Amino acid sequence: GKSGAIIEVNCETDFVAKNDEFLALTKGAADLVVSANPADVAALSVLPFGESTLEAARTALVGKIGENMTMRRFVRTEAKGKLFSYIHGGAKIGVLLDLVGGDEQLGKDLAMHIAASKPKSLDASGVSADAIESERRVAIEKAKEAGKPEAMIEKIAEGSVQKFLKDVTLLGQVFVKA
């Protein structure tokens, strides 16, 4: 199968985010995640990179550029289908999509949609019970404050929960290109 990775590396300014050496370090770190499959950022930082380790390369670049940068988190996946990636907004938003079925255009469009709409999960089954309950409580509170009749409050709350689920699930959202 094909492996892919996405990594979050934070810096302080857009100037550094566009710097070729910073971009090379970030790409190198993502490549290391794919090839070495480290357990976490600490394990990633001690992996061989260039003449030394990734952490040594990061520290040297911080010294050279004069701005801090941190490897915050990463995700690695073994694709079941075809991997698509989409990086948006000067690399501030990134999507790594494993698509089983579909074609090249669908993969690109879905990755772009995910970047734009930021779904929390594929469908309602992936939304935590706590998030749903919190949404329900807020809706009940608002309905009571608005003086809605007691008999309607539960229906109003259920409608709010359904709208929330449409907004936060990939399958519930209106497709960006629609």
Predicted feature residues:
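N-terminal assembly/interaction segments in proteins that build large macromolecular machines
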Residues: G1-A178
